[in-house]
Swiss-Prot record:
InterPro entries: UPF0180. This is UPF0180 protein GK1051. Signal peptide: none annotated. It comes from Geobacillus kaustophilus (strain HTA426). Belongs to the UPF0180 family.
Length: 80
């Protein structure tokens, strides 16, 4: 299953993705994003640790204003 990086403050999203079988890793910095198929960030820092620019070639989803369910749907859409 895909490896999804999620900011630590998004615990509900982490749990929802784990329930769907994804390998979830907390994004604390640039190193954590390496090898992720997709990253979910809060949007407070839209370029957390350079993730948009360098580290991951996968999609980056901004979680602000979305429910955990909506984020899971976006992850699934992006990984198709």
């Amino acid at each position: 299953m895909a490896k999804i990086g999620v900011e630590p403050s998004l615990t509900d999203v982490q749990e929802a993705l784990k329930e769907r079988g994804y390998d979830v890793v907390p994004l604390r910095g640039e190193q954590d994003a390496r090898g992720c198929d997709c990253c979910v960030i809060t949007g407070l820092d839209a370029n957390i640790a350079g993730i948009h620019n360098i580290v991951t070639s996968g999609p980056v989803i901004e979680a602000s204003g979305l429910t955990a369910e909506e984020i899971c749907q976006k992850v699934e859409e992006k990984l198709r």
